Curated annotation (Swiss-Prot):
It is found in: Mitochondrion inner membrane. NCBIfam families: 3a0801so1tim17. This is Mitochondrial import inner membrane translocase subunit Tim17-B. Belongs to the Tim17/Tim22/Tim23 family. GO terms for cellular component: mitochondrial inner membrane; mitochondrion; TIM23 mitochondrial import inner membrane translocase complex. It is a multi-pass membrane protein. Pfam families: Tim17. The lineage of its organism: Eukaryota, Metazoa, Chordata, Craniata, Vertebrata. The keyword Iron-sulfur does not apply. Component of the TIM23 complex at least composed of TIMM23, TIMM17 (TIMM17A or TIMM17B) and TIMM50. The complex interacts with the TIMM44 component of the PAM complex. The complex also interacts with DNAJC15. Disulfide bonds join 9-78. The gene is Timm17b. Essential component of the TIM23 complex, a complex that mediates the translocation of transit peptide-containing proteins across the mitochondrial inner membrane. The chain crosses the membrane at residues 17-37, 61-77, 113-133. It comes from Mus musculus (Mouse).
Amino acid sequence: MEEYAREPCPWRIVDDCGGAFTMGVIGGGVFQAIKGFRNAPVGIRHRFRGSVNAVRIRAPQIGGSFAVWGGLFSTIDCGLVRLRGKEDPWNSISSGALTGAVLAARSGPLAMVGSAMMGGILLALIEGVGILLTRYTAQQFRNAPPFLEDPSQLTPKEGSPAPGYPNYQQYH
């Protein structure tokens, strides 16, 4: 599967890093807004202030964590594309596993194995769903079979039975 909308590898890393940061800030912002609202003292003004404060403090941190994950994933993916010479789902699956392992390296080998498995499984699921969606949508755009004329709508040939009356023949 080739992805035609993707940037070339050096720019892909920057693009994925920025996209992951944005996704982390937005998703983390929503989550932190709800968390800050629920944990603030009673009163709408206090709850609103707690919500904004939680977003202001935590959303950039979450975005940064997502950016690190996206940048490392994209760097490993580009390295595998260069090493293997082809771009396929196995690169993404391997990149997810290696990214999980590298980011969990400070927690020890057992955490590295667990994170590698989770990263590989997560990316395998994402790639599998992408392949299924691509195949499903490709079926919608297949060429339709040619339209065949209905024989009952054609004009009768000389000496052939009239349409709708199989045993009736004209005599000359």
